[in-house]
A protein has these predicted regions:
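N-terminal structured subdomain of primase-like DNA metabolism proteins
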Residues: 1-76, 86-124, 210-213, 224
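TOPRIM fold recognition
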Residues: 1-11, 32, 50-52, 58-60, ...
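Short, polar loop/linker segments at the starts of domains and inter-domain junctions
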Residues: 2, 27, 57, 106, ...
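Short, well-ordered strand-loop elements centered on a beta-strand within folded domains, enriched
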Residues: 46-53, 73-76, 80, 85, ...
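Short amphipathic beta-strand/extended segments with alternating polar/hydrophobic composition
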Residues: 60-65, 134-142, 265
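Intrinsic-disorder/low-complexity linker and hinge segments
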Residues: 64-86, 168-172, 290-299
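Short acidic alpha-helix initiation/capping motifs at coil-to-helix transition points
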Residues: 83-89, 257-259
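Phosphate-handling DNA/RNA-contact segment within nucleic-acid enzymes
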Residues: 117-219
């Protein structure tokens, strides 16, 4: 966390009434969920606030969710200047600070561009990723002002395909995770999981799978369907698994259990340090429950 952002965050954290810093930690804050003085965070890097009552509360808050206004003016906070001539300064900051990514892993995958809405007469810097014959871009300057927070190139089609990092050769992997968004792919990449982005839950990547199937021959990998945990994502997970199995693919699934009002995706989990091997095991268990074909198989999974 850079100095200016840390100062602003530290000032606002006073609302939780933490005890004075000890050993680099802030403890004894009032948890917004249970109202107990069990909230704690790292004093130097207060990205995540956690309630210590694991059995009775255990709520987790990312600083972006608590103070979103600190994370929605990237061009203003991190501009390209005569001293810093980086044309991707705002995009770099958004990905590194806002998303928690290691930029060294992302070089060449994105550019900083600009989107202007002529009807609203407003614009925003964007983080743009090439996608097939077009692109997908995320608006990063107060995106709530626009009708959509992200755009595809006008007129392009992506259904039947997917997005993947250029450095990954899918013919050499034993598992491919299929997720909804590009940032989900990048988050999983940071923990050694090879993934592709479908760009929407209803996109079955038939063309991409057919091409991979032809390239791999009989050496099929396992497809791990890891869509969002909302009703649409869960329903399409089951539909896609059925379709992929009918095409000869081995399939599994992974699901993040959802709690509270805010949905948690793979990038959120990464920023909350919730993509450890134990976490992944839990997510795969919930995915297996979701796609279990019979009540008996689901009951067996729960029993084991």
């Amino acid at each position: 966390m850079d100095t200016s952002l840390h100062q602003e965050v530290s000032t606002r954290l006073a609302e939780f009434n933490f005890k004075p810093e000890q050993s680099g930690m802030l403890r004894g804050g009032v948890c917004p969920a249970c109202q107990k003085k069990e909230l704690y965070t790292n004093a130097d890097h207060p990205w995540v606030l956690r309630c210590g009552r694991l059995n009775n509360c255990g709520e987790v808050y990312h600083i972006k969710d608590l103070y979103p206004d600190l994370f929605d003016k990237w061009s203003e906070r991190y501009p390209s200047t005569p001293e810093n001539k980086n044309p991707h300064a705002a995009a770099d900051a958004y990905l590194q600070i806002g998303r928690g990514f290691d930029l060294a892993k992302l070089r060449g995958l994105y550019t900083q561009e600009y989107y202007y809405d002529s009807k609203l007469n407003i614009g925003s810097a964007t983080v743009r990723f090439s996608l097939g014959s077009g692109y997908w871009e995320r608006l990063i300057d107060q995106p709530q002002r626009f009708i959509k927070k992200a755009n595809f190139k006008f007129g392009m089609h992506y259904h039947g395909s997917w997005w993947k990092p250029d450095q990954i050769d899918l013919q050499d992997v034993k598992e491919i995770w299929l997720v909804e968004g590009i940032f989900d792919v990048i988050a999983l990449m940071h923990v050694g999981i090879h993934a592709v982005a479908l760009m929407s839950c209803n996109n079955y990547p038939e063309q991409a799978l057919s091409q991979l199937q032809a390239a791999c021959g009989n050496q099929h990998c396992t497809l791990v369907w890891a869509l969002d945990g909302d009703p649409a994502g869960r329903n399409f997970t089951k539909k896609h698994v059925d379709q992929a199995r009918a095409a000869g693919w081995n399939c599994a699934a992974a699901q993040i259990p959802q709690r509270g009002k805010r949905a948690i995706d793979w990038n959120d989990a990464y920023q909350r340090d919730a993509l450890t091997p134990d976490h992944i095991k839990t997510y795969r268990y919930h995915g297996a429950l979701l796609i279990a074909p019979t009540r008996e198989e689901k009951a067996l999974l729960m029993y084991l």
